[in-house]
């Protein structure tokens, strides 16, 4: 029996016409709309029945499997929650409840959710008190995965292994954005029970907003070397994440990763959150930090940062400051047209080795710079010159270059990260990098005492510092930056993409002989890469040989996720070494290395590592063929 249609002139009939056939391109979009819609009408609805997309066979094949995380359901029936109606009479047949309902279905094109049917005529008046008591914003999103009350309660707190297991037990559906991240954290705790992890969920939604973590070994490293901290932030990573890494500088002048923070794009006050979480994880370092070098965003959070680190000088990374200044000049319309030499003048300003040199460069900027940009510079950067000019730098008297340390870490980071847009895969890569950095404690130092960690940075000492000074004075910072210059890694990303087509980072295991052949090929590539004494990969392998008890076996496979379970004896070494040929090609493409330089490095490194004659001849032959 068909239900009677309400008269078109009534309010309910008009609302039904407006709601029917309305489309939504994600379940989260529908949930936000429905929360506001219910609040306007004081209406209470709950999910009576539903069909999850994970049960549809056609949705499990790529690329349609992404629909599971976005649309979540193929069918949902929402009915009115008439709280005053008796649930079931003691005697007699059950009484009919409120007839109001809404049906949402997947569209025939399978790209959106559509309201196909609705009846908004209720059998009871609306009650504001009942609505205020029973209504829970975001309850539709909670039904998709986790209860909102649970995520709101645990958000912004450090979680223990038991908390992660409890969250996994609460999960109701296959929301891979949450499930995969929780599985990675569960594996991390299984491998390192002393790790520190803080989770932040979007308010009233079961959506991960921020993850902060550090392992027990990097926390010990931070407590050992807290004097100088560096912050490397990569906004818009893969177009889907913001990444912030806190580095410490060890006794040999190497930048070592201490903690990481992964967040949704545009998350406010990420630096303050990361520093506060870091100090909560290691409170004894608060009064021992003497210098913090971060990006230009630190200026907007300066009072909070100084409150967190009262004994530290706060600096702006000169390289990032220069890019920010030049981008602002382009925005104001002066760079390249009114003043084509602006980039060189900015480099001389930032690299001034004395107050006199700074005043001279500033006078030149006033004389030749665009008026709008000079006014902006005087208001925003000149009062803070102690934070970004070289002669006032904290590390200048210690023969260190914070900018070079940050650049070196960023290169290593971009080589390690796979081109995945998910939080879970990013966490896997970052945990692997922290383990690799921790393994560097056992790496023998090179002749210059710098070890393999500053492979691409100018040498320390007077000669290296003089080279950096000459580069600043001549404006040789790799050329004027263009839009998106921070992401000069197109070649690297292409190589990673090709590698992913065969490795299948999305979760598929290696299949039969094809997978084993790929492993053997990558292992051989790793053997050739091992002949580079100044490379990060070689340092990790040597360190891993000395620390087999910490870095091998099923413990490492646990947190790496199910897609790597087929690798029986690889451990962390296999993770770090796979694709090293691709990474080396990407690094040469990024930094301008030539094949001839790489071949000379291979020959020199073979003598340092005392490799076998067989390995040397094979490496030389392969490099000659490539060339």
Swiss-Prot record:
Region Disordered: start and end of each range? 441-466, 608-627
* Residue stretches of biased makeup (Basic and acidic residues): 615-627
Record's keyword annotation contains Ubl conjugation: yes
Q: What are the alphabetically sorted keywords of the record?
A: Isopeptide bond, Ubl conjugation
Checking InterPro entries in the record gives: DUF5575_C (IPR049218), DUF5575_N (IPR049217), ZSWIM9 (IPR040854), ZSWIM9_RNaseH-like (IPR048315)
> Could you identify this protein by its name?
Uncharacterized protein ZSWIM9
In which organism is this protein found?
Answer: Homo sapiens
**Lineage of the source organism?**
Eukaryota, Metazoa, Chordata, Craniata, Vertebrata
């Amino acid at each position: 029996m068909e239900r009677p249609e309400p008269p078109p002139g009534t309010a309910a009939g008009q609302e039904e016409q407006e709601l029917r056939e309305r489309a939504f391109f994600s379940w989260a979009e529908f949930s936000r709309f429905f929360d506001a819609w219910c609040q306007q009408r004081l209406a209470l609805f709950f999910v009576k029945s539903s069909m999850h997309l994970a049960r549809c066979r056609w949705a499990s094949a790529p690329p349609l499997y992404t629909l599971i995380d976005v649309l979540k359901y193929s069918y949902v029936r929402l009915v009115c929650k008439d709280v005053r109606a008796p649930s079931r009479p003691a005697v007699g047949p059950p009484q009919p409840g409120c007839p109001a309902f809404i049906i949402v279905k997947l569209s025939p094109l399978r790209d959106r959710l559509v309201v196909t049917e609705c009846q908004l005529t209720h059998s009871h008046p609306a009650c504001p008190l009942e609505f205020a008591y029973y209504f829970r914003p975001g309850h539709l999103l909670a039904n998709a995965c986790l209860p909102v009350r649970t995520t709101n309660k645990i958000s912004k707190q450090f979680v223990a292994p038991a908390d992660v297991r409890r969250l996994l037990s609460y999960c109701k559906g296959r929301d891979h954005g949450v499930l995969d991240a929780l599985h990675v954290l569960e594996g991390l705790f299984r491998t390192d029970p002393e790790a520190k992890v803080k989770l932040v969920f979007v308010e009233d939604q079961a959506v991960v907003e921020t993850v902060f973590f550090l392992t027990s070994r990097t926390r010990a490293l931070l407590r050992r070397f807290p004097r100088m901290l560096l912050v490397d932030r990569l906004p818009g990573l893969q177009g889907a994440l913001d990444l912030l890494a806190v580095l410490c500088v060890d006794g040999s002048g190497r930048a070592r990763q201490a903690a990481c923070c992964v967040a949704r794009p545009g998350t406010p006050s990420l630096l303050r959150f990361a520093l506060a979480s870091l100090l909560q994880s290691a409170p004894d370092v608060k009064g021992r930090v003497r210098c913090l070098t971060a990006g230009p965003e630190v200026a907007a959070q300066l009072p909070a940062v100084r409150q967190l680190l009262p004994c530290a000088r706060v600096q702006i990374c000169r390289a990032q400051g220069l890019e920010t200044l030049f981008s602002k000049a382009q925005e104001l319309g002066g760079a390249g047209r009114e003043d084509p030499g602006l980039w060189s003048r900015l480099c001389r300003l930032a690299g001034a080795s004395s107050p006199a040199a700074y005043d001279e460069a500033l006078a030149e900027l006033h004389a030749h710079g665009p008026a709008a940009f000079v006014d902006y510079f005087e208001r925003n950067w000149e009062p803070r010159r102690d934070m970004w000019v070289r002669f006032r730098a904290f590390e200048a008297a210690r023969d260190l270059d914070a900018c070079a340390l940050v650049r070196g870490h960023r290169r290593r980071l971009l080589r390690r990260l796979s081109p995945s847009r998910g939080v879970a895969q990013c966490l896997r890569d970052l945990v692997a990098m922290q383990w690799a950095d921790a393994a560097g404690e056992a790496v023998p130092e090179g002749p210059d005492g710098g070890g393999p960690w500053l492979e691409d940075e100018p040498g320390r000492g007077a000669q290296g510092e003089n080279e950096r000074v000459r580069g600043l004075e001549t404006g040789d910072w790799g050329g004027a930056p263009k839009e998106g210059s921070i992401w000069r890694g197109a070649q690297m990303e292409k190589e990673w993409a090709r590698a992913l087509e065969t490795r299948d980072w999305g979760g598929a295991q290696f299949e039969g002989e094809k997978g084993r052949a790929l492993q053997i090929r990558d292992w051989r590539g790793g053997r050739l890469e091992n002949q580079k004494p100044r490379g990060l990969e070689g340092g990790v392998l040597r360190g891993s040989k000395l620390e087999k008890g910490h870095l091998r076996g099923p413990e490492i496979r646990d947190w790496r996720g199910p897609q790597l379970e087929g690798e029986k004896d690889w451990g962390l070494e296999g993770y770090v070494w796979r694709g090293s040929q691709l990474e080396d090609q990407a690094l040469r493409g990024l930094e301008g290395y030539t094949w001839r330089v790489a071949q000379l490095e291979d020959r020199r490194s073979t003598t340092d590592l005392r490799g076998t004659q067989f390995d040397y001849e094979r490496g030389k032959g392969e490099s000659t063929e490539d060339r």
